[in-house]
Amino acid sequence: MESIGELLSKRPDVRGNFDKLVAEVMKNEQVQAFISENQMTEDEIQRSYSKFYEFVKERKKFEEHEKMAAEGYEPVLTMNHGYADVSYQTTAELAARQEASSQLRRVKIIGLPKEMKHIDFYGDVFTDNQNQFDLFRKVENFIDNFPQEKGLYIYGDFGIGKSFIMAAMANELSSKKGASTTLLHYPTFISDLDFDNAKYWVNEIKKVEVLVLDDIGAEMNNAWVRDSILQVILQHRMQENLPTFFTSNLNMAELELHLAETKKTDEIWPAKRVMERVKYLASEVHLEGVNRRHE
């Protein structure tokens, strides 16, 4: 097989086209800047002609938004053992899309609207009164100091934004701290459990990085749910100091009464054991406001 040099010596027309192509490529400002930055010798430049050509051709496609083999990647020149090479790096736009996708994946929603993944902490959370603003600052403080701060037990009336601010917190933790949060509607979670899948789900939920048990106290309580599900989840999270949040229509004292009520009798001490773990994991906060669900 003939070398390029032999072919060029036999075909003046090819040589002329080649020289013209090289001259065109070498006029490219990015190629010139690369040669200057890397102080390339004449020999290195000559050995890089084909790569310079590839770069100029692919760069033109990229800048003119033509179809490329690797969408979302832009060609850049690099040095590779004495000659220029072309590599393809992620564009800022693709990197932003990938990060946005990663942020969404880090927020897991179970039994709640998926739209909660798009609630913005600073743009969407209501702070209409001092009480709401105080809660906002507590949650903001948790985010800023993550993972050192204790979780919160937020209770109050229906529709005042308890779940809303927890979703906003999860999204902000994902974007600001790269942290993963699971928001779990506790009554739905409990209603979907049975003896066959309970062990799997308890092991999954108890280990998540940040956990929000939403609407706790609204579930149908029984001894199995309280002692084999909730207690096991909270015990693990207490031992591992994993951030845990709760929302409820009940305050802590009312939740204890709810947990003590079973079909058999009032089981005060098992309920107290669970509440000791709740109190270890979270500080009680009363949220006040108007019901916004029907606005």
Predicted regions and their residues:
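Walker B catalytic acidic pair
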Residues: 215-216
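Short glycine-rich substrate-engagement loop in P-loop NTPases that contacts/grips substrate
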Residues: 127-137, 149, 155, 170-208, ...
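N-terminal nucleic-acid engagement/recognition segments and initiation subdomains in replication
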Residues: 1-71
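Loop/turn-to-beta-strand initiation segments
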Residues: 179-180, 207-210, 240-246
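N-terminal pre-Walker A segment at the start of P-loop NTPase domains
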Residues: 111-146
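Interdomain "pre-motor" coupling segment immediately N-terminal to P-loop NTPase/helicase cores
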Residues: 55-112
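Walker A/P-loop nucleotide-binding motif
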Residues: 146-167
